[in-house]
Every structure is written in structure tokens, then in C-alpha cells.
């Protein structure tokens, strides 16, 4: 039985393989949520400081306050706002501007070519989750999506860019 890797394990793996990483910050709730959220973001920043140069890091979250904390504690890393398809509304640019982000990570459900082109033409990167069909991945790439999240990376290797 394999163990679930710790964040330290992920940092070690990234350093050994020179693999870029996406760190998704999850919300903290409860009566002490604000303090715990700040502590979590500080700890993530401390761990990421041990990454070797040249490893690209993206910090992403559905949680806007966490992305603002990431901007404070980790301004050197790119930040992405994660959207469910139904939550992507007309105020999306305001949200990204508030977070200091130039990246939209959006759910694949009902994503259209018009929406992809609108986001890309506005100067934002666009990553789509979760794309497991090769045909759909090709279509999104042809429409201009910057990247995809997939459970089937071995089937998507043809999309790798230099």
C-alpha cells in the first residue's frame, strides 16, 4: 500500500525531477479560520522556499482571501483563481485583478470556444480541469487554452510544449 505524500515529499519530488507544481490552497473554516488560514499560507511559503531555481510554481484556489494572502507571502509565484463553470460570471476580471492573478483555472463543463477566446483575448492564461479525453484536450488546445488538468497525463503527452 502506497502512502499519501506529504508536502515535504512533493517538494523533494519536484526538486529531484524538476517538475513544475500547482499548489491548490484549500479553505480553512471554523472560529479560528482566519488565523489558521494565514498560518497555512505562511507554512506553504516556507516550504516552497526550499524549491530549486527553475521550478515553476502556480498557487491556485477557489478561495479569494487565501489568494490575497498568497500574494502577500509569495508574490514571486503566479496565482490562479479556480472557477466552477457555473460560478464564472461577468465579474471574473475584477476577481482576478483583486488577487493579482493573470490565470483562470476553469471547470471543463460546458466550456465553449467563445469563452476560451474571450479569456485569452483579454490577456489571461486559461487552464481547464479535469480533461481526460484526448479529443477534448486537442479541441481545447486548438481553441487556445494554455493548459489542462488531467487524470490521464500519459495520454496527453502529445500536448507538451517546449
Q: Which role does the model predict for each range below?
A:
Residues 1-81, 99-100, 106, 122:
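Metal-dependent phosphodiesterase/phospholipase catalytic core, i.e.
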Residues 80-162:
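C-terminal active-site rim and adjoining tail of enzyme catalytic domains
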Amino acid at each position: 500500500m502506497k502512502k499519501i505524500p506529504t508536502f515535504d515529499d512533493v517538494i523533494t519530488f519536484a526538486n529531484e525531477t524538476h517538475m513544475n507544481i500547482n499548489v491548490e490552497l484549500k479553505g480553512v473554516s471554523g472560529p479560528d479560520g482566519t488565523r489558521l488560514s494565514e498560518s497555512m499560507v505562511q507554512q506553504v511559503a516556507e516550504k516552497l522556499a526550499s524549491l530549486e531555481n527553475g521550478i515553476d510554481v502556480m498557487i491556485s484556489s477557489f478561495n479569494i482571501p487565501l489568494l490575497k494572502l498568497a500574494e502577500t507571502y509569495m508574490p514571486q509565484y503566479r496565482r490562479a483563481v479556480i472557477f466552477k463553470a457555473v460560478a464564472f460570471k461577468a465579474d471574473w476580471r475584477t476577481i482576478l485583478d483583486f488577487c493579482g492573478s493573470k490565470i483562470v483555472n476553469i471547470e471543463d463543463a460546458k466550456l465553449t470556444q467563445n469563452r476560451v477566446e474571450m479569456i485569452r483575448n483579454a490577456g489571461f492564461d486559461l487552464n481547464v480541469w479535469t480533461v481526460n479525453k484526448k479529443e477534448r484536450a486537442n479541441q481545447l488546445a486548438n481553441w487556445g487554452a494554455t493548459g489542462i488538468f488531467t487524470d490521464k497525463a500519459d495520454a496527453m503527452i502529445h500536448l507538451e510544449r517546449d
